[in-house]
Amino acid sequence: MNKEQFLEKIKGGIIVSCQALPGEPLYSENGGVMPLMAKAAEQAGAVAIRANSVRDIKEIQKAVSLPIIGIIKKDYLPQKPFITATMKEIDELVATSCEVIALDCTLRERHDGLTINQFIKKIKEKYPTQILMADCSNFKECENAYSAGVDFVGTTLSGYTEESKKQDGPDFELLEKLVEAKIPVIAEGRIHSPEQAQYVQKIGVDGMVIGGAITRPLEIASRFVQAVESVEKL
């Protein structure tokens, strides 16, 4: 699958992020949970899956026939980038044959000492046909990553870095700016409702990832609990 085929596949659809980290209720040392999430997403009509870790990706590949955006989350403290942050993670993801690899493309200091542009160049040299998605937090990062050679950008990290604006919902302003600049973009981050997803779609994005609103029951339940508790009794 090449970039054009992937973008055509996800056009007008929903990519569901199926992830659980250690310490979260749906995380299991033995695995087996995320492929069930992915199977439910596929039955609902999702067009692709975003997944974290080699184990989960392999399990999901056996459960569904959807393309996968693969990542590996690993801390390299004190540096902040942790989404597919070094060539080691790239190598491991390539070995899974996942269709797309997403990586932190912020301009923050990296563990490997490379600039993000140097890292992208090395990946493209080593794996010239691998589709790459840039997880970014602002327009400057997206513009830089796209010019450096990634296939499309994602607003994944908007609101989660010091270089971006914190907000409760999707970063509509950033999405609009990227579409206007004709930079291929997958919307991701805090799309909590079908209405927000509709608005994102109308902006003209190439695709969208929804995670917490679908596959994180703790987050979903908490939102309902907070809403009910905030209502004054009649």
From Swiss-Prot:
Catalysed conversion reaction: an N-acyl-D-glucosamine 6-phosphate = an N-acyl-D-mannosamine 6-phosphate
InterPro entries from the UniProt entry: Aldolase_TIM (IPR013785), NanE (IPR007260), RibuloseP-bd_barrel (IPR011060)
This protein's UniProt keywords: Carbohydrate metabolism, Isomerase
The enzyme's E.C. designation: 5.1.3.9
Enzyme class: isomerase
Domain of life: Bacteria
Pathway: Amino-sugar metabolism; N-acetylneuraminate degradation; D-fructose 6-phosphate from N-acetylneuraminate: step 3/5
One of the Pfam families matching this protein, by short name: NanE
SUPFAM superfamilies: Ribulose-phoshate binding barrel (SSF51366)
Gene3D superfamilies: Aldolase class I
GO cellular component, one term: cytosol
BP GO annotations: carbohydrate metabolic process; N-acetylmannosamine catabolic process; N-acetylneuraminate catabolic process
UniProt keyword annotation of Glycoprotein present: no
Signal peptide start-end: none
A GO molecular function held by the record: N-acylglucosamine-6-phosphate 2-epimerase activity
HAMAP family (alphabetical): ManNAc6P_epimer
General function of this protein: Converts N-acetylmannosamine-6-phosphate (ManNAc-6-P) to N-acetylglucosamine-6-phosphate (GlcNAc-6-P).
Protein family according to the UniProt entry: Belongs to the NanE family.
Name of the protein in question: Putative N-acetylmannosamine-6-phosphate 2-epimerase
Organism, as annotated: Lactococcus lactis subsp. cremoris (strain MG1363)
